[in-house]
From Swiss-Prot:
GO terms for molecular function: ATP binding; proton-transporting ATP synthase activity, rotational mechanism. Belongs to the ATPase epsilon chain family. It is a peripheral membrane protein. The keyword Membrane applies. It is found in: Cell membrane. InterPro entries: ATP_F1_dsu/esu_C_sf, ATP_synth_F1_dsu/esu, ATP_synth_F1_dsu/esu_N, ATP_synth_F1_esu_C, ATPsynth_dsu/esu_N. F-type ATPases have 2 components, CF(1) - the catalytic core - and CF(0) - the membrane proton channel. CF(1) has five subunits: alpha(3), beta(3), gamma(1), delta(1), epsilon(1). CF(0) has three main subunits: a, b and c. This is ATP synthase epsilon chain. Residues 89-110 are annotated as: Disordered. One of its GO terms (biological process) is proton motive force-driven ATP synthesis. The keyword Membrane applies. One of its GO terms (cellular component) is plasma membrane.
Length: 139
């Protein structure tokens, strides 16, 4: 019996489908969600969001947000989400370099925090894109 997953951003619905498992990066560490999971509300951290359906793993890069888990339904309200195969690795690398430069030049704690958050987001995007590229080569 699958669990229904909805991934939503402010712009659009990214995914609405029945899946077998969800593995998400939360404030308290990675959480694996299977059908009939206990109710849970948690904060998502930037990281790799994995969706398993019919034995196939689909990785996403998530920049943060919230996840509500009910026994037969999971809703993810994400700041940003990208499928691994949608990430432009060259643009992500350029954005990472720009975030590192902003971090070095930060004059205030606020600027430093913003630059570090952007850097974490771009590092996640790069890691997810690179893992997807390796998986494609192995197939």
């Amino acid at each position: 019996m699958p669990i229904h997953l909805e991934i939503v951003t402010a712009e659009r619905v990214i995914l609405s489908d029945d899946v077998d498992m969800i593995s998400a990066p939360t404030k308290d560490g990675r959480v694996g969600i299977l059908p009939r999971h206990a109710p849970l509300m948690t904060i998502l951290e930037p990281g790799e969001l994995d969706i398993i359906k019919n034995g196939e793993r689909t990785p996403f890069a998530v920049s943060g947000g919230f996840m509500e888990v009910l026994p037969h339904r999971v809703t993810i309200l994400a700041d940003t989400v990208e499928r691994a195969d949608e990430i432009d690795e060259a643009r992500a690398e350029q954005a990472r370099a720009e975030a590192e430069a902003r971090r070095r030049e930060a004059q205030s704690e606020r600027d430093m925090a913003l630059a570090e958050a952007k850097l974490r987001k771009e590092m996640v995007r790069l890691r997810v894109a690179q893992l997807h590229k390796i998986k494609r080569r192995q197939s």
